[in-house]
Amino acid sequence: MAAPGRRWSVLLFRALQSLSARRALHDTAPPRDVLLFEHERGRFFAVLGLFCAGQGVFWASLAIASLARPPTPVRPTDAKTPDHGGLDLRSTLWRYGLAVGCGAIGSLVLGAGLLFSLRSVRSVMLRAGGKQVTLTTHAPFGWGAHFTVPLNQVSCMAHRGEVPAMLPLKVKGRRFYFLLDKAGHFPNTKLFDNTVGAYRSL
């Protein structure tokens, strides 16, 4: 008599396991698109784009001005012209060094602003079926740019509770991390943690 009861217990346990597995699969494979993250900062990135553009123009104008040769004073033809070869060489080196420095600073400001805007995530959308995810970044001037990748090519490098401000996402085939500001809105935290927020070895 104990054998049939044990058999029914095993069958019931397997049925419950199958039901829980199907429910978990359904949770991570929604029938329609689901918004997982959203953080609107269009005004901030518009101001950041204008600031970086202004800095680029400013440092470029300084570099051009430093390359301009200063006017040489007019001397009488009968006066003896002293030899200023060493002084001219130092002046030329200083002007070219200043131009290179100004160009480097301007390029650094522009590059940092461009990279930050292209890697700051505005929204994360899990596509129907749970196989693909669409990331939308703020892009320069807050214009926005989006791309869709398979979910198995996205890896979250830290849990939401482990980082104070920014959540880093690694996308296979793309350099640098994508940043999710924790000040944003997570409409479905459980689904986010099980899909985009999960760590994967890429």
From Swiss-Prot:
Keyword Iron found: no
Name of the gene this protein is made from: TMEM223
Coarse class of the protein's main subcellular location: mitochondrion
TM helices/strands, residue ranges: 44-64, 98-118
Keyword set, alphabetical order: Membrane, Mitochondrion, Mitochondrion inner membrane, Transmembrane, Transmembrane helix
Sequence similarity: Belongs to the TMEM223 family.
UniProt-recorded Gene Ontology molecular function terms: mitochondrial ribosome binding
Function according to Swiss-Prot or TrEMBL: Mitochondrial ribosome-associated protein involved in the first steps of cytochrome c oxidase complex (complex IV) biogenesis. Stimulates the translation of MT-CO1 mRNA and is a constituent of early MT-CO1 assembly intermediates.
Membrane-protein topology: Multi-pass membrane protein
Keyword Transmembrane helix: yes
Organism: Bos taurus (Bovine)
Source domain of life: Eukaryota
Ranges per topology, Mitochondrial intermembrane: 65-97
Location of this chain's protein in the cell: Mitochondrion inner membrane
Cystine connections: none
PANTHER family: TRANSMEMBRANE PROTEIN 223
InterPro entries reported for this sequence: Tmem223 (IPR026100), TMEM70/TMEM186/TMEM223 (IPR045325)
Gene Ontology cellular component list: mitochondrial inner membrane; mitochondrion
Biological process per Gene Ontology, one example term: mitochondrial cytochrome c oxidase assembly
A Pfam family: TMEM70
Mitochondrial matrix side: 1-43, 119-202
Record-given protein name: Transmembrane protein 223
Subunit relationships: Associates with the mitochondrial ribosome.
